[in-house]
Regions:
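Structural signature of tandem-repeat unit edges
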Residues: 1-5, 13-28, 38-51, 61-81, ...
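Conserved hydrophobic site in ankyrin repeats
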Residues: 212-214, 243
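Non-catalytic accessory regions outside enzyme or core folds
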Residues: 177-185, 220, 243
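Charge-dense, extended regions
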Residues: 229-261
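Hydrophobic/aromatic side-chain positions at a characteristic register within alpha-helices
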Residues: 201-205, 232-235
Length: 261
């Protein structure tokens, strides 16, 4: 558990909890269980919960990441409940019993009521691609092929480019259950936005991620040079080394010819 305030004499305050890990023994989450955990960003738990109460995440306004560890082959309803409670963009990392992982982004959506004055009634509208992504469950169990199949449809909707980048990157990087057909669709998007993807990974100082991205994309000389310059300015030696090695591999400098007279 991570809190904003720690040390001798510090008083417990659920409003200061930033990251919370639940034990494997938890089987029931009651009504309003995390009420007013206003600083909570990440919830780590096991997929063993069999009952979810009402409004468990009320006023958890910063919570945007669920890390879910499977206990066995049976998938339960935790992910369905989590994404159903959040209309904002959220991320879920699902780790299977064999250690393989899928990291999914569920985009934001909004439910809007507009007053139709002449008819004295309200009209209900849904905006944003996130709503359809919350329908990729069958009997409250995640269907990964359905999630991946939405990608091309998503690109035809109104969406945030940064969100699309996170979706494509995380699904390709943590790719449990990902077919090659769908992997290529995500890969194509990253090839079209390689500069932005490199910038994102530089900001995160993710050396392993950057190395993986370079195996999946085809950055040109100018992209690599710009990224290397940024890594140099950041003082990020590991990232710079990865980029310089990639430059040398893709665009080797010809050896100088010498002659003995």
């Amino acid at each position: 558990m991570t809190r904003g305030l720690v040390g001798p004499g510090a008083l417990w305050d659920n409003r200061e909890v930033e990251e919370l890990s639940l034990p494997t023994s938890v089987r029931r989450i009651g009504n309003y269980a995390f009420l007013n955990c206003r600083s909570l960003r990440t919830l780590r738990m096991y997929d063993g919960v069999r009952f979810w109460g009402a409004s468990a995440f009320m006023n958890c306004r910063l919570l945007d990441h669920l890390h879910l560890q499977r206990l066995d082959e049976e998938q339960r309803e935790t992910l369905y409940y989590f994404v159903g409670e959040m209309s904002r963009e959220v991320q879920a990392t699902i780790v299977d019993t064999d250690g393989s992982a899928a990291r999914l982004v569920f985009p934001e959506y909004q439910e809007i009521y507009e007053e139709n004055v002449p008819h004295h009634q309200f009209e209900f509208h849904i905006q944003g691609a996130g709503y359809v992504y919350r329908q990729v469950f069958r009997n409250k169990k995640l269907a990964l092929p359905d999630y991946d199949a939405l990608w091309k449809k998503f690109l035809g909707m109104e969406y945030e480019p940064d969100c699309a980048l996170r979706m494509a990157w995380r699904r390709l990087r943590w790719n449990a259950g990902l077919s090659e057909e769908h992997a290529e669709a995500y890969r194509t998007y990253l090839r079209q936005h390689t500069a932005e993807a490199m910038e994102m990974l530089l900001a995160e100082r993710d050396g392993a991620g950057l190395a993986f991205l370079l195996t999946q994309t085809e950055p040109d000389k100018e992209m690599l040079a710009a990224a290397a310059a940024e890594a140099r300015d950041m003082g990020a030696a590991e990232l710079l080394a990865i980029l310089l090695e990639e430059q040398h591999k893709r665009f080797p400098v010809g050896r100088m010819k010498t002659f003995d007279l």
